[in-house]
């Protein structure tokens, strides 16, 4: 099972923070610094997450920050292996069906799903009333992404679903 970590930037309402809820339920560990063997979810990374990345890392780390402040938050350099997620639709009530406007829990769940742990992805999302909505919107494409072996496979999948790559 993949270790789940979060760097809490504390930029959002703590009552609505999906990462804080994961920490509260013991599903994620809060960290102040990332390590070299963690996969850092970075929406500005040049490389897209692939299932083969699993052999490079021992954990997945989400950077919990406000989307409004994301460009500033990610100017900070984090140790680890940065990867962006392929295009996905948000299932959360704030950004419902917006492309790539995921909460931290949605991003972490998508990452562990693509890395081959769909049970962990379900466990993470089950703590949220709207968690099932994320899977309803993305189930088929997540299955396809989890089989992709290269960036060009991701591009083909995006074309198939008419999403920007």
Where does each model-flagged region fall?
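Long, charged alpha-helical interface segments
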Residues: 139-165
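Active-site cofactor/cluster-binding pocket
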Residues: 15-103, 107-110, 114-143
């Amino acid at each position: 099972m993949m270790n789940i970590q979060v760097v809490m930037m504390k930029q959002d309402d703590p009552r609505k923070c999906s990462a804080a809820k994961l920490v509260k339920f013991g599903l994620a560990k809060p960290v102040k610094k990332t390590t070299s063997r963690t996969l850092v979810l970075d929406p500005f990374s040049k490389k897209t997450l692939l299932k083969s990345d699993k052999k490079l890392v021992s954990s997945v780390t989400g950077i919990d920050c406000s989307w409004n402040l994301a460009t500033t938050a990610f100017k900070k350099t984090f140790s680890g292996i940065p990867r962006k997620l392929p295009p996905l639709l948000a299932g959360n009530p704030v950004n419902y069906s917006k492309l790539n406007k995921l909460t931290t829990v949605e991003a972490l769940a998508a990452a562990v799903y693509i890395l081959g742990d769909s049970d962990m992805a379900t466990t993470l999302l089950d703590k949220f009333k709207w968690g099932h909505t994320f899977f309803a919107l993305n189930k088929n494409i997540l299955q396809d992404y989890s089989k992709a072996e290269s960036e060009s496979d991701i591009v083909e999948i995006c074309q198939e679903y008419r999403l920007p790559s």
